[in-house]
Amino acid sequence: MHVLDGSSGGGQLVRTALTCAAVSGESFRMRYVRRARSNPGLQAQHCAAVNAVADICDAATDGVEVGSEAFSFEPEVAAEEADDDEEPTLGGTTSVEVGTAGSIPLVFDSLLPLAGALDEPITATLTGGTDAKWAPPMDYFQHVKLPLLREHGIDATVSVDRRGFYPRGGGEATLTVEPSTPTPITLTERGDREALTAYSVAESSLADDEVAEQQATAAAPDAAHEIAYTDADSAGSAVVLAAEYEHSRAGFAALGERGVSADAVGENAADALAAFESGPGAVDSHLADQLVPVVAVAGGEVRAPEVTTHIETCVDLLAEFDYDIDIEHTDDGAVVLSA
């Protein structure tokens, strides 16, 4: 069993460990989970990720509860303990409540890298936050990350049944991942921008003030606009700029907050897009972080705007499972990740 140190990382480290264990069949125990965070230990969305992946690979777990700073994960043990004649399989159906506004897209992130190792499809239905703080909104997941992964052989789709905004959540979405043959993810050049779409969503009570329209216009007045109003348990809003380039994709998001105007929310997304396009990355920094475990199992080369703590800690953890990723710093400040 691998003994992993979770003190220097956050939820991304937990999700990466789950990916490695499910694909390799190797067990781990993680100690000092998120110790450097202001709220150390597992939080609700991390527990949801552990439980979802455990369902998919018949894992036995211990210590999976909110606040726990140590937990273990043993793939295929639950199937073996069932004492039947069926071989353990990777895939199946899971339904997990993330809790309040815990991020549904971040839990989905723990399942996507499994695509190339699946014996049968994954169908994962989660309830919680679709558009939550400190996480990519659902439109980023749906219109930036998934299209990029599909271009590289990962057959995954998501349906959103209900939006969930901070703080109450209450959203619901279902991810389907088919057994796939991923191709190496080679994203070293950005090229010219070929398309830009502003996806702007707000809870129905904000329609009279045209919050979604204002966000989209402030973010990108000349882009295509996809405007949506939706019933939800909490009032909230989000805007995502989905940019398509000659050789890559990137996304830039901002969430509505009490006391922040819709125009300011849109401008935050616009500023992030402008900063990215003035820099050297082929993908945005959030996508680069999330692609690390996918590159580890599928191979490839990704040019990120910068090396983040998420990248460094995940690369170190991947090495524990014999997945080697090289980090090359370039003269223009970018970093190239290759496997």
Swiss-Prot record:
<dbReference type="GO" id="GO:0003963">
    <property type="term" value="F:RNA-3'-phosphate cyclase activity"/>
</dbReference>
<dbReference type="GO" id="GO:0006396">
    <property type="term" value="P:RNA processing"/>
</dbReference>
<dbReference type="InterPro" id="IPR013791">
    <property type="entry name" value="RNA3'-term_phos_cycl_insert"/>
</dbReference>
<dbReference type="Pfam" id="PF01137">
    <property type="entry name" value="RTC"/>
</dbReference>
<feature type="binding site">
    <location>
        <position position="109"/>
    </location>
    <ligand>
        <name>ATP</name>
    </ligand>
</feature>
<dbReference type="InterPro" id="IPR000228">
    <property type="entry name" value="RNA3'_term_phos_cyc"/>
</dbReference>
<dbReference type="Pfam" id="PF05189">
    <property type="entry name" value="RTC_insert"/>
</dbReference>
<dbReference type="GO" id="GO:0005737">
    <property type="term" value="C:cytoplasm"/>
</dbReference>
<keyword id="KW-0436">Ligase</keyword>
<dbReference type="InterPro" id="IPR017770">
    <property type="entry name" value="RNA3'_term_phos_cyc_type_1"/>
</dbReference>
<comment type="similarity">
    <text>Belongs to the RNA 3'-terminal cyclase family. Type 1 subfamily.</text>
</comment>
<protein>
    <recommendedName>
        <fullName>RNA 3'-terminal phosphate cyclase</fullName>
        <ecNumber>6.5.1.4</ecNumber>
    </recommendedName>
</protein>
<dbReference type="InterPro" id="IPR013792">
    <property type="entry name" value="RNA3'P_cycl/enolpyr_Trfase_a/b"/>
</dbReference>
<feature type="binding site">
    <location>
        <begin position="286"/>
        <end position="290"/>
    </location>
    <ligand>
        <name>ATP</name>
    </ligand>
</feature>
<comment type="function">
    <text>Catalyzes the conversion of 3'-phosphate to a 2',3'-cyclic phosphodiester at the end of RNA. The mechanism of action of the enzyme occurs in 3 steps: (A) adenylation of the enzyme by ATP; (B) transfer of adenylate to an RNA-N3'P to produce RNA-N3'PP5'A; (C) and attack of the adjacent 2'-hydroxyl on the 3'-phosphorus in the diester linkage to produce the cyclic end product. The biological role of this enzyme is unknown but it is likely to function in some aspects of cellular RNA processing.</text>
</comment>
<keyword id="KW-0963">Cytoplasm</keyword>
<dbReference type="InterPro" id="IPR036553">
    <property type="entry name" value="RPTC_insert"/>
</dbReference>
<keyword id="KW-0547">Nucleotide-binding</keyword>
<dbReference type="InterPro" id="IPR023797">
    <property type="entry name" value="RNA3'_phos_cyclase_dom"/>
</dbReference>
<dbReference type="InterPro" id="IPR037136">
    <property type="entry name" value="RNA3'_phos_cyclase_dom_sf"/>
</dbReference>
<keyword id="KW-0067">ATP-binding</keyword>
<feature type="active site" description="Tele-AMP-histidine intermediate">
    <location>
        <position position="310"/>
    </location>
</feature>
<dbReference type="GO" id="GO:0005524">
    <property type="term" value="F:ATP binding"/>
</dbReference>
